[in-house]
Amino acid sequence: MQTSPSSTAPCADKALDDLLKEVDRRRNFAIISHPDAGKTTLTEKLLLYGGAIQEAGAVKARRSQRSATSDWMAMEQQRGISITSTVLQFDYRGKILNLLDTPGHQDFSEDTYRTLAAADNAVMLIDAAKGLETQTRKLFEVCRLRHLPIFTFINKLDRPSLTPLELMDEIEQELGMNTYAVNYPIGTGDRFRGVYNRLTKTIHLFERTGTHGSKKAADQTMALDDPALESLLGSDVYAEFQDELELIEEAGAEFDLAAVHGGEMTPVFFGSAMNNFGVELFLQAFLQYAAKPEAHDSNRGTIEPTYEEFSGFVFKLQANMDPKHRDRIAFLRVCSGKFEKDMVVKHPRTGKTVRLSRPQKLFAQERESVDIAYAGDVIGLNNPGAFTIGDTVHTGEKIIYPPIPSFSPELFAYLRSTDPSQYKNFKKGVSELQEEGAVQILQSLDESKRDPILAAVGQLQFEVVQYRLQEEYGVETRLEPLGFSLARWVVEGWDALEKAGRLFNTVVVKDRWDAPVLLFKNQWNLEQVAGDCLDLKLSAIAIPPSL
């Protein structure tokens, strides 16, 4: 692999020094979790401790004063779930953190997949009562593909739960990575009193304030050998804590930051996001151990974040974030150099130059103009059809970053307009929603069937498409479900396609790039086809064509 082209374009000393300092300040991460693990609550509490909000939005939302900070779409507010992604930037102790807030509902994981393409770190949030769940496992596999450092926050320790040792063992056995409990809990459920920081050798006892977590939690810090500790905890809790601590100190792995950054070890933190227990300690440790903005592979080799020429890629599109203006925003991850307002960049996919004249920082529904940004930052670009997901923009010599893959959907249905006179609006709406990545669109190989096939990872995704077509394009639609549950893209073995389509109740369709896709009724059908058509190589991931 080539080295970074930075040596061919030397910076002035001060400019390079400033660039190095700004990149060093950035930390970028996404939270992955199963629904109801507490992602929105943890997000808000991180913002609370980061000083971005003064009171936790979830608490105020329950009082019907406003919605949670990170939710904005009308349907989200009606349903009480996160459907879209946004970016939340805040300063903490001299660092700039970019939290790539992602949908928490299981029906919107593909948007999360794309967001993980822009993340340098992942925070895996686990419900202490439930352990690892389906959605978390799926998202973990995407993190593993990208070798992302994963920090684990085990939530809801103030409720009945599995034991800390059971939870860590499950992570090790099912995900195949070592764990290191940085903050080990003292008691669980109604006996949850605090945590012991194994790296700083300090005890942190939490005080219940009665504010339901809307304000920062107070804690009492003391040494592990403080003679007052046993009386404060009670003899039973103290003895149980000492026994478990002795066990993990003797049998557990040593903390290895290189293994963390390689995705081979996950630092584990315990707490209660609702009551703010352990949140600030987690944030402090994350700041210390998280990976800085990473280098990215490109057509020219590895591009370091400190390369002087600006570059970045679009990982998300979102229309109508402000319904009054029917706008369209492209979310761009800065990969190298310094972004400046009004700069002119090259757009390799179209061969054109584009002036980035109205860049925005996106804090949920709020926006403010951005004058400069650096690697690890995410900015919003007004996008009148100029960009699509995976686009690269850059200054200097041509840079193209790898395209963002699509993942296998699990639900399929024909989408039909109920009013033929609205077909033009219907077609426009479907096209724009596809460009956003709101849903995958497949087409039948039968030219007489012009209606698109929606391919989604959950039923609610269909509902969102229908809702937005009606609200934003004035088109009413109906769905005709198809009885398939798996999709696989054909990598090799084209000659076997006809046979696979004729046998085993399997259908061949095409994606937006006209690549063949096989739809299967179930896993059993997939295994039958794979066993019978040995020359047929299939993939659960689709890589868009390169430029």
UniProtKB/Swiss-Prot annotation:
Chief localization: cytoplasm
Coiled coil: none
Chain positions recorded as GTP binding sites: 33-40, 101-105, 155-158
Domain tr-type G stretches: 24-294
GO biological processes: regulation of translational termination; translational termination
InterPro entries tied to this protein: EF-G-like_DII, EFG_III/V, G_TR_CS, P-loop_NTPase, PrfC, RF3_C, RF3_dom_3_sf, RF3_GTP-bd
Pfam families: EF-G_D2, GTP_EFTU, RF3_C
CDD domains: RF3 (cd04169), RF3_II (cd03689)
A molecular function (GO) term: translation release factor activity, codon nonspecific
GO cellular component: cytosol
Subcellular location: Cytoplasm
Keywords: Cytoplasm, GTP-binding, Nucleotide-binding, Protein biosynthesis
Similarity-based family: Belongs to the TRAFAC class translation factor GTPase superfamily. Classic translation factor GTPase family. PrfC subfamily.
Function: Increases the formation of ribosomal termination complexes and stimulates activities of RF-1 and RF-2. It binds guanine nucleotides and has strong preference for UGA stop codons. It may interact directly with the ribosome. The stimulation of RF-1 and RF-2 is significantly reduced by GTP and GDP, but not by GMP.
PANTHER family hit by this protein: PEPTIDE CHAIN RELEASE FACTOR RF3
Name the UniProt record assigns to this protein: Peptide chain release factor 3
Organism: Synechocystis sp. (strain ATCC 27184 / PCC 6803 / Kazusa)
Name of the gene this protein is made from: prfC
